[in-house]
Regions:
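A residue-level signal for conserved active-site and pocket-lining positions in enzyme catalytic cores
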Residues: 48, 116, 151, 155, ...
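Two-metal-ion RNase H-like nuclease active-site motif
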Residues: 1-8, 100-102, 272-274
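C-terminal, non-catalytic extensions of nucleic-acid polymerases
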Residues: 334, 401-626
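Entry/capping segment at the start of metal-dependent catalytic domains
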Residues: 1-16, 23
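Conserved "right-hand" nucleotidyltransferase catalytic core of DNA-directed polymerases
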Residues: 7, 118-126, 132-282, 362, ...
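Helical catalytic core of nucleic-acid polymerases
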Residues: 98, 107-112, 122, 127-139, ...
Length: 626
């Protein structure tokens, strides 16, 4: 595998390649070498950041012999919003094989500069203006080469984090005899090929729900309104939402799913997390809701059965110490088929997918929430409901035998399996943000406040890697009563846990920050920011909008900021103790815990706002010592 990255100028272009050992860089004068390199490595996998939408297109145009001026024209078109598919069709680029793995494929969009920040690398932006209307000087070329090598290395680090995903994709290609070009396809496209989907345009997209397809039994008239919302209509209304009280918890009912939770809630004692195993896939099978666009609808249940069989085989071989007897494809297949199975439901809602079947996707989502309401209704006399989400519920069981009996009846009726995880603590801000401690001591953190708690244990690179230390402090206080002061000062943390990677958007032309009372422009549009201890020297980070000459503050940052765009891998807080304001992070943890646990009516406000008083109220509410 190799990473590649292009730098495009008005009268020059640079093609950079890195294979993990050496950098290869070609300028436009080296077109023959570029073509020769491509011929030698055209069967390799080429990895790039956003390469599917940019680099792969321009690289193929270079191979066709386009001039630097023409390449720049195409580059500007793409940057300004032209659809790359149009360029591909017009120039017949699909005829040039390039096995491109786009790092951003099926991922949340983020820039390479943000990735460099998340990874702890130096955040390096070009010193050479891409819009220079002349040939580059020797010095400018050297600066561009240096910048290009930096980006290639950063992309290589990203690729290493996706190595298993690449192996899984190659295993699926081998198992189903797909063309190698499918390495560049989305998960939905690969899934559509494996399941032999056929592009379809069903006319019944918003057809009212047919309650006869599933054994839904809802007796409570109030709860029954959820069923009526989807049946008593001429067509399904995607914008309509229904709010009803179910088991003492306000729920929102909509096409996409069921959501309800006790807000700012905590409980210590026996808790059950009751989830439906593989909810959507099993509903598709049990209630005949597979995509009607599949040539052979029986393919989907076969895939599900195949995954269970290969998963069992792999686990058995590994447990017996016979892992070396498994092929690489077999080892990857449980994960590959899980990806296929879990991709289908989303593909059914995607208009240009071969599995597109909007009606069955709607009915599947509706069936799922109605069956959960059915389950809650039957359990209600024997439990307290904590929350409901798309595929499961959290409950406090008061009569465990009765709860188990109703769960078994529901399973027998639906043919679905409920997986019960017993826990001992839950702290819940709302349906999207909670911390659940399991009976075995394991922790499930969900939502923007706490999801980064275990980033360092789940791989180096995460798409969202800002202020990890806050997530650590919130979870450790809620579950273990660890004071935020101890969290911050009791460990010599790696510095990246305190970083805020901030990138200004395209509507802004410049970035700066306050130093000694002066606004100092920064060369970077993306910066790694920390709370600054020296409050007299450092101030806000600023941005300037296109067409204006005044500075605005960059949002969600401290009053006093210190920018460090250097490589901070291996750097500890103790190394910068004179620069970083640890008290700010401690107070931010407290502020977020207040937000997590206190209702608006329970907090101080306006002129009377006091973090100290809010923090005291948190401790009282949670029964902690003051």
């Amino acid at each position: 595998m190799r990473t590649y990255d292009l730098e495009i100028f008005a009268h020059d272009y640079l093609v950079g390649i890195y294979d993990g050992q050496k950098y290869i860089q070609y300028w436009n004068e080296d077109i023959d070498k570029i073509k020769a390199d491509y011929e030698e490595h055209k069967n390799d996998i080429w990895c790039g950041h956003n390469s599917g939408s940019y680099d792969s297109i321009l690289f193929k145009l270079i191979l066709l012999g386009n001039t630097p001026e023409k390449i720049k024209e195409y580059s500007d078109d793409i940057i300004n919003g032209r659809n790359g598919r149009d360029i591909i069709r017009k120039n017949k680029l699909q005829k040039i094989p390039l096995y491109d793995w786009d790092i951003l494929l099926d991922k949340v969009m983020y820039s390479l500069k943000e990735a460099e920040g998340f990874l702890g690398l130096e955040i390096c932006e070009t010193e050479v203006d891409f819009n220079l209307d002349r040939k580059l000087t020797k010095e400018e070329r050297e600066l561009t080469e240096k910048y290009n090598r930096h980006d290639l290395y950063a992309t290589w680090q990203e690729m290493l984090e996706q190595k298993e995903s690449i192996k899984i994709r190659m295993a699926l290609i081998a198992e189903y005899n797909l063309p190698k070009s499918m390495i560049s396809a989305t998960n939905q496209k690969v899934t559509g090929e494996i399941l032999e989907g056929q592009y379809s345009d069903f006319k019944d997209k918003q057809e009212p729900y047919d309650p006869s397809i599933a054994p839904v039994e809802i007796n409570n008239p109030e709860y029954h309104k959820a069923l009526e919302m989807f049946t008593d209509c001429d067509q399904l209304d995607y914008k309509k939402k229904l709010k009803i009280d179910i088991a003492g918890v306000e729920h929102t009912i909509a096409i996409g799913g069921l959501h309800g939770a006790r807000t700012k809630y905590h409980y210590e004692g026996e808790i059950w997390d009751v989830d439906v195993g593989s909810y959507y896939p099993n509903m598709m099978i049990n209630f005949n809701l597979c995509s009607r666009a599949m040539k052979n609808p029986e393919n989907f249940p076969k895939i599900v059965a195949k995954r269970l069989a290969i998963k069992k085989k792999v686990n058995t071989y590994l447990a017996e110490g016979r892992g070396d007897e498994l092929t690489a494809v077999e080892k990857a297949m449980p994960y590959g088929l899980k990806l296929v199975v879990n991709t289908v439901s989303g593909a059914m809602k995607a208009k240009f997918s071969k599995l597109y079947d909007e009606r069955n996707n709607n009915w599947m989502c509706i069936t799922g929430q109605l069956l959960l309401i059915d389950l809650i209704e039957k359990l209600e006399p024997y439990m307290t409901l904590i929350q409901s989400n798309t595929d499961g519920i959290f409950i406090i069981p008061h009569d465990k035998e009765a709860c188990d009996r109703e769960i078994k009846r529901w399973e027998d009726k639906t043919g679905l399996i409920l997986e019960k995880t017993v826990g001992k603590k839950i702290f819940q801000k709302d349906v999207n943000n909670y911390v659940f401690e399991r009976e075995d001591g394991g922790v499930t953190p969900r939502g923007a406040y706490v999801a980064q708690r275990y980033n360092d244990e789940h791989g180096l690179f995460q798409c969202r890697r800002n202020l990890d230390i806050l997530d650590v402090g919130i979870v450790d206080y809620l579950l273990y009563n660890k004071d935020p002061h101890e969290t911050i000062y009791g460990t010599d943390w790696l510095l990246w846990k305190f970083q805020m990677v901030k990138k200004i958007g395209g509507m802004y032309k410049a970035c700066a920050y306050e130093v000694d009372g002066k606004i100092i422009p920064t060369p970077n549009r993306c910066n790694r920011v920390f709370a600054a201890k020296n409050k007299e020297k450092y101030g806000k980070v600023k941005k300037m909008k296109n067409g204006k000459e005044t500075w605005d503050n960059v949002e969600s940052l401290p009053e006093h900021c210190w920018i460090n765009n250097n490589d901070i891998r291996g750097v500890h807080v103790s190394d910068v103790i004179d620069d970083i304001d640890l008290e700010w992070y401690e107070n931010e943890i407290k502020r977020k815990i207040c937000d997590f646990t206190l209702e608006t009516s329970e907090r101080t406000k306006g002129k009377n706002y006091s973090l100290e008083e809010d923090w005291r109220r948190v401790q009282v509410k949670l029964g902690r010592e003051i």
